[in-house]
Amino acid sequence: MAQLDVNNIMGDPFALVTLSMAMIGWLLSLVTCVISDVQGIFPNYVWWAVTYMFVTIIGLAIVMGSQTSHVYAIAIVGYLAAGLCFTTLAVNSLVYDGSATKQAAAAGFILQSMVIIIWIFYFGSTPRSSTRGYLDHSGGAGNEHHSYRNSKPISNSYGRPETTVSGNQPPQMYTSAQLNGFETSTPIAGYPSTATDNPNNAGRFGQAPIGSQTNLTPGNNPVVGAGGISLGMGGATDPSNANEISQPTEYPYRAKAIYSYEANPDDANEISFAKHEILDVSDVSGRWWQAKKATGETGIAPSNYLILL
């Protein structure tokens, strides 16, 4: 569950400035609306706008403080769009009045409307947009905390690299006894015969052909696990190769994390990283990138949590 941390707001200039401006505008409109209501006739609708904006500002402060804006971005834009309508109607009800307090209240709603427009543009943009990327980069990585992490933000249907661990399926083990009788005794067009009764069926390098009884004797038969990973001779599993993806030697790209991410504990190939952390990336194709942290730790990372530098 996301944890609220005030440092996430204090360390983010965009969140700090916009929330401060919105709260100043709301306080200005609240005080002047109270004074105007005491002095004389006051449109009751404006109180709904004041209440709605207070709840909206508090909600956005919680979202920014817990770094869950990427989870609630669509809902945030919807609430802000409604709030922009309410503040605009409140301005229209107050700005044309000759009372100085009502005009001051209208000024407070105008300030809130300006902040709402900025928020709609920010939360309505994708993390890969240039403006959104610039605002995200303005936050210091040193002030970032692991306040929000999701171990499974992306489903496996996005083309995630499959491993014997992440597949959650027992590997299919085949021994020579199980394969007995499946050898091809009749030659097929374009393929050499692998029958064991053919004396000329020796391998090119003096070994028995693949699929022959000689090649599949107990203790020599290669066992294949799920995903086509060879488990060695005689069915012995090599733990260093069965559960890990081969590591590249070069990382020509650099990427910056736009969100925090915690690796799935059931998959040793994933890595965890914090927001604004810089990673070296070897390949930017696909939805999961092979990345390397500054500490030397390597693994796969979801591409929609990263932005290329």
From Swiss-Prot:
Q: Which SMART domains match?
A: SH3 (SM00326)
Residues annotated as transmembrane: 15-35, 45-65, 71-91, 104-124
Q: Which residues lie on this side of the membrane: Cytoplasmic?
A: 1-14, 66-70, 125-309
Q: Which residues form the signal peptide?
A: none
The region called Disordered is annotated at 134-175
Q: Name one Pfam family in it.
A: SH3_1
Does Hydrolase show up as a keyword for this record?
no
Task: Name the SUPFAM superfamilies for this protein.
Answer: SH3-domain
Q: What positions does the domain SH3 occupy? A: 250-309
- Return the Gene3D superfamilies for the record: SH3 Domains (2.30.30.40)
- Which key words are in the record? Cell membrane, Membrane, SH3 domain, Stress response, Transmembrane, Transmembrane helix
Subcellular localization: Cell membrane
Extracellular compartment ranges equal 36-44, 92-103
Biased composition regions of type Polar residues, renumbered to the chain? 150-175
Q: Does the keyword Membrane apply?
A: yes
| Chief localisation class | membrane
The membrane topology term of the UniProt record is: Multi-pass membrane protein
- InterPro entries according to UniProt: SH3-like_dom_sf, SH3_domain, Sho1_SH3
| Listed GO CC annotations | plasma membrane
Provide the function of this protein.
Answer: Plasma membrane osmosensor that activates the high osmolarity glycerol (HOG) MAPK signaling pathway in response to high osmolarity.
Q: Summarize the subunit comment.
A: Forms homooligomers.
The UniProt family comment states: Belongs to the SHO1 family.
Protein name as annotated? High osmolarity signaling protein SHO1
Q: Which organism is it from?
A: Paracoccidioides brasiliensis (strain Pb18)
Q: Which gene encodes it?
A: SHO1
